[in-house]
């Protein structure tokens, strides 16, 4: 499972020019799944993301988690995180999970994030989406359960 986390001051996802989800300060998560991804990997990522200390404390040090600052999450599915660009000029996405399995993984991931008490807004799995965000920092962190 792969997640690209960006700390944002605001973010939104639109489908057909209609805002489907939006947040204020928090994390934009771009989420990709493979066929072999498991609930244990989801649990690991949920724990890491919900406890990740990348928000500044009063001393200006990255020392606070998203829970500490009352932040929100916008989670957007993105199979292109599994792009293979080693051959040719057109990426291959054979490493991305079967859509049915990946959708289940994405849903479980979002449900478990919400179960931590975080507000979680989402896109729609498989939809053509437009994502708008304002990076804060910028802070961008890559998670890969296979790395």
Swiss-Prot record:
Positions of disulphide bridges: none
Entry superkingdom: Bacteria
InterPro entries hit by this protein: Daa-tRNA_deacyls_DTD (IPR003732), DTD-like_sf (IPR023509)
GO MF: D-tyrosyl-tRNA(Tyr) deacylase activity; Gly-tRNA(Ala) deacylase activity; Ser(Gly)-tRNA(Ala) hydrolase activity; tRNA binding
EC number, UniProt record: 3.1.1.96
Keywords (A to Z) from UniProt: Cytoplasm, Hydrolase, RNA-binding, tRNA-binding
Any one GO cellular component localisation term in the record: cytoplasm
Summary of the function given for this chain in its UniProt record: An aminoacyl-tRNA editing enzyme that deacylates mischarged D-aminoacyl-tRNAs. Also deacylates mischarged glycyl-tRNA(Ala), protecting cells against glycine mischarging by AlaRS. Acts via tRNA-based rather than protein-based catalysis; rejects L-amino acids rather than detecting D-amino acids in the active site. By recycling D-aminoacyl-tRNA to D-amino acids and free tRNA molecules, this enzyme counteracts the toxicity associated with the formation of D-aminoacyl-tRNA entities in vivo and helps enforce protein L-homochirality.
PANTHER family: D-AMINOACYL-TRNA DEACYLASE 1, D-TYROSYL-TRNA TYR DEACYLASE
Protein name: D-aminoacyl-tRNA deacylase
Upper lineage: Bacteria, Bacillati, Bacillota, Bacilli, Lactobacillales
Chain's gene name: dtd
